[in-house]
Curated annotation (Swiss-Prot):
UniProt organism field: Halomonas elongata (strain ATCC 33173 / DSM 2581 / NBRC 15536 / NCIMB 2198 / 1H9)
All residue ranges annotated as the PDZ domain in the record: 263-354, 360-462
Signal sequence, renumbered to the chain: 1-26
EC number: 3.4.21.107
Keywords assigned by UniProt, alphabetized: Hydrolase, Periplasm, Protease, Repeat, Serine protease, Signal, Stress response
Family: Belongs to the peptidase S1C family.
Catalytic activity: Acts on substrates that are at least partially unfolded. The cleavage site P1 residue is normally between a pair of hydrophobic residues, such as Val-|-Val
Entry's localization field: Periplasm
UniProt-listed Pfam families: PDZ_2 (PF13180), Trypsin_2 (PF13365)
Lineage of origin: Bacteria, Pseudomonadati, Pseudomonadota, Gammaproteobacteria, Oceanospirillales
Protein name (Swiss-Prot/TrEMBL): Probable periplasmic serine endoprotease DegP-like
InterPro entries xrefs: PDZ, PDZ_sf, Pept_S1C_Do, Peptidase_S1_PA, Peptidase_S1C
Length: 474
């Protein structure tokens, strides 16, 4: 065989290998065409409108005009709204519109989406795949899981098949259909990057992390597996630019349907509650407790009238398991307890003084269980802020303060947490009103305006602090 013949044969072998490799790769890539054709009719576009009071602020050198657009880009549309309105400031009504996605879960018109898509909306319109546009009623919304249920007046609507989010595996292919930037029925795909992901202030949801391209307008839309089953609701992204950066998060459909069923049947969502203040177990704390590695949730304080204190848990206990399920980190405990129906017993494995022991606790109901659309009894209680308080006991007063209530628990998804209030703080005053008791606090909260923030004075670690508190709209 000549040298040229050998080179020709080698070139042909390499070409065949490359073609075979490309063919094998093409066979492995999924085809989403059938999935999209079957699922698209049940995916909807959601548009909302709400009227807000804006204000022309005397903002420094801008002489009473609105905040310039360049600053709105960096600080957000509501930056000016967070500031108290000074004397002479003028306001006006303005209609704001937003877009999102959703999907039909029943033939008689129930639709699932994100709570943040419809939050504060005066009007909700749903655009169907067949071109119809229908007004929707908000059946209920749960801000802790970011799930909302809508209802349109229609029959014989197409629906989607729901999958099982418990069977998900990292690396499997998934696809999303939604309306990014209003471009309805856009399809994107990717893989599951991680499961059971906990995000700050979203402790009740074990998120599905994907690399599917999700952008504003995709929120509330379905995430599918290759069988065309809905396994999640696309909810949020991690971004530094305002757009997709490869980190997208979806609410598992099992979690979403549990919430949706409660909203449809009961008008509210019940969650288990222990009445404890917890903190992470650091490596140093783990060493001090004689643990092999950091894990579990350390109980730092208890509500003396709560289920945990009543049934024998103590400050300093490290909760390691809930009914046999490992508590990998402190953020896992609220999620595990939250899925237990109030009134049911759970067996907790705890570490106390270097010894493991089991403690049975009858789970209570979270003080601020979310109510359905329109609100219900309890909306004006301290729970409306997402916190629980108790009176100051003897010895808890300080020379610097002579009134207030102690914050014993803060819901990480509530308005109090967003304002910077922590468990252990003493809430001294709201606006110009001193807080004397939990009962009086309830009255003050019931009188708070929803159109502006109010100053709240806190006492923490020997110092006074002020935070701006804005109520979530009912």
């Amino acid at each position: 065989m000549t040298r040229m013949t050998r080179h020709l044969a080698l070139w042909m072998l390499l070409s065949l290998a490359i073609l075979a490799s490309q063919s094998a790769m093409a066979q492995k890539l999924p085809d989403f065409t059938s999935l999209v054709e079957e699922a698209a009719p049940a995916v909807v576009n959601i548009s909302t409108s709400r009227t807000v009071e804006t204000r022309n602020m005397p903002f420094g050198q801008f002489g009473g005009q609105e905040l310039p657009e360049i600053f709105k880009h960096f600080f957000g549309e509501r930056f000016g709204d967070q500031m108290p309105m000074p004397p002479g400031a003028q306001g006006h009504s303005e209609e704001r519109r937003s877009l999102g996605s959703g999907f039909i879960i029943s033939e008689d018109g129930y639709i699932m989406t994100n709570a943040h898509v419809v939050e504060g909306a005066d009007e909700i319109l749903v655009s169907l795949n067949d071109g119809r546009e229908l007004k929707a009623e908000l059946v209920g919304a749960d801000t802790k899981t970011d799930v909302a249920v809508l209802k349109v007046d229609a029959d014989n609507l197409p629906t989607l098949t729901l999958g099982d989010s418990e069977d998900l595996k990292v690396g499997q292919w998934v696809a999303a259909i939604g309306s990014p930037f209003g471009l309805d029925h856009s399809v994107t795909s990717g893989i599951i990057s991680a499961i059971n992901r906990t995000l700050p202030r979203d402790v009740y949801v074990p998120f599905i992390q994907t690399d599917v391209a999700i952008n504003p307008g995709n929120s509330g839309g379905p995430l599918f597996n290759l069988d065309g089953e809905v396994i999640g609701i696309n909810s949020q992204i991690f971004t530094r630019s305002g757009g997709y950066m490869g980190l997208s998060f979806a609410i598992p459909i099992d979690v979403a349907m549990d919430v949706a069923d409660q909203l449809r049947n009961d008008g509210s969502v019940s969650r288990g509650w222990l009445g404890v203040m917890i903190q992470p177990v650091s490596r140093e704390l783990a060493d001090s407790f004689g643990m092999d590695k950091p894990q579990g949730a350390l109980i730092a304080d208890l509500d003396p009238d709560g289920p945990a204190a009543r049934d024998g848990l103590k400050a300093g206990d490290v909760v390691l398991e809930v009914d046999g399920q490992t508590v990998d980190s402190s953020s896992a405990l609220p999620r595990l307890i939250g899925r237990v129906s109030p009134g049911n017993d759970v067996e907790l494995k705890v570490l106390r003084n270097g010894e493991h022991r089991n403690v049975t606790v009858t789970v209570g109901d979270w003080p601020d269980s979310q109510k359905g659309a329109g609100g219900s009894a309890g909306d004006t209680a301290p729970a409306r802020l997402g916190l629980a308080v108790r009176p100051l006991e003897e010895g808890q007063h300080d020379q610097a303060i002579d009134n207030g209530v102690r914050v014993v628990e803060v819901d990480p998804t509530g308005v109090a947490a967003k304002a910077g209030i922590r468990a252990g703080d003493i809430l001294v005053s709201i606006g110009e009103h001193a807080v004397e008791s939990p009962e009086q606090l309830s009255e003050l909260i019931g009188e708070l305006p929803e159109d502006r923030a109010v100053p709240v004075r806190l006492y923490r670690s020997g110092h006074s602090y002020y935070v701006a508190l804005r109520l979530a709209q009912k």
